[in-house]
Amino acid sequence: MITYKTGNILHDQADAIINTVNTVGVMGKGLALQFKKAFPDNFKVYKKACDEKSVVTGQMLPVPLNSISAPFYIINFPTKAHWKGKSKLEYIEQGLESLKAEAKRLKLKSVAIPALGSGLGGLSWQAVEQLIQTSLAELPEVEWRIYPPQAAPSAAIMPNKTKKPAMTKGRAAVLGLI
């Protein structure tokens, strides 16, 4: 079943939340940056997989969160080959097939999905939405929660579980010299 949601996808209690990524290990802007801050352990797994060249377009990288409550997985969905490039509809189409297979394998009942490749990726939301509708309708036993394009939340309300680096007097002195 496909439903539409609004709000911050990072707060969704679906079994899995989709994170749109590239294949080179950079989460520097947009939704990926929000995921990097909210789920730092996911970033470590993703970065290591990219360094090993095992993240490729068309294939999902599910990362278990080892949580007792949903979400249980972050599923990294490569929508771009490189962070400097644009997304391609073929990456979305191939990725949706892989996502359906992962949903079956992981026995997911619900998945929260952002506007794949439609923000910084540059794809038309209408074209992406059509692919999502057509592909995911084939697996109606999963609740697919679609988050259409919307403005980014303010920095003050974004989840941030990253640790602040310790600023010692010595480090401050060195920075003061620069």
Language-model regions, residue ranges each:
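Macrodomain-like recognition of ADP-ribose-binding/processing modules
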Residues: 1-178
